Amino acid sequence: MSNMEKHLFNLKFAAKELSRSAKKCDKEEKAEKAKIKKAIQKGNMEVARIHAENAIRQKNQAVNFLRMSARVDAVAARVQTAVTMGKVTKSMAGVVKSMDATLKTMNLEKISALMDKFEHQFETLDVQTQQMEDTMSSTTTLTTPQNQVDMLLQEMADEAGLDLNMELPQGQTGSVGTSVASAEQDELSQRLARLRDQV
């Protein structure tokens, strides 16, 4: 097995591992959603909110893993092409010895240009691999947008057939719905302010 074939194997393996990680995160998200429903049914909104944050985090992680898996898979496909073309060139080299006449008519400039393209592709491959590593490291620090948490809480309450406002303990009534509405109101206010500034 050549170095390039080993590299290809490692890329394909990495793509599968990333895909497995995405599926694991999907399972974790579903488990957290089930915990949200139980917490809402018990009227424990603080615990429900924690599970909602965890569920959103797992969902975001799953998307990131899936995206990276696709990128690594795309890079692996490029390497596969390069490895295959390398093999074709070697097999051609054996045949070429008996093809002096054909060799004499070959355009060396075109061969040289083709080699340059190969080298450039592998340089690009290295850059993309580095970008992939940088992206993966940056996605490990994930924040959980509160409006997503609020929306998920409402969705889980709806699925459980509960009215959040009715089931909430005294003093917390309507906190989820209100915070979503106020967040939307804040966003509208900011948009209006930006429009005024532009005029």
From Swiss-Prot:
Q: Which parts of this chain are annotated as the region Disordered?
A: 167-199
What species does this protein belong to?
Homo sapiens (Human)
Please describe what this protein does. Probable peripherally associated component of the endosomal sorting required for transport complex III (ESCRT-III) which is involved in multivesicular bodies (MVBs) formation and sorting of endosomal cargo proteins into MVBs. MVBs contain intraluminal vesicles (ILVs) that are generated by invagination and scission from the limiting membrane of the endosome and mostly are delivered to lysosomes enabling degradation of membrane proteins, such as stimulated growth factor receptors, lysosomal enzymes and lipids.
Entry annotated with the keyword 4Fe-4S: no
Q: Where is this region: Interaction with VPS4A, MITD1 and STAMBP?
A: 180-196
Annotated keywords: Cell cycle, Cell division, Coiled coil, Cytoplasm, Endosome, Membrane, Protein transport, Transport
Segments carrying the region annotation (Interaction with VTA1) are: 180-199
Q: What is its main location?
A: cytoplasm
Q: Which PANTHER family match?
A: CHARGED MULTIVESICULAR BODY PROTEIN
Tissue specificity is:
Widely expressed. Expressed in pancreas, kidney, skeletal muscle, liver, lung, placenta and brain.
From the Swiss-Prot or TrEMBL record, give the protein name: Charged multivesicular body protein 1b
Give me the ranges of the annotated region Interaction with IST1.
132-156
- Entry membrane topology: Peripheral membrane protein
**Localisation per UniProt entry:** Cytoplasm, Cytosol; Endosome; Late endosome membrane
Query: Single Gene Ontology BP term?
Result: multivesicular body-lysosome fusion
**Name of the gene this protein is made from:** CHMP1B
Question: Mind telling me which InterPro entries this protein's record contains?
Answer: Snf7_fam
Q: What is the lineage of its organism?
A: Eukaryota, Metazoa, Chordata, Craniata, Vertebrata
Q: Which chain positions lie within coiled-coil regions?
A: 26-48, 178-199
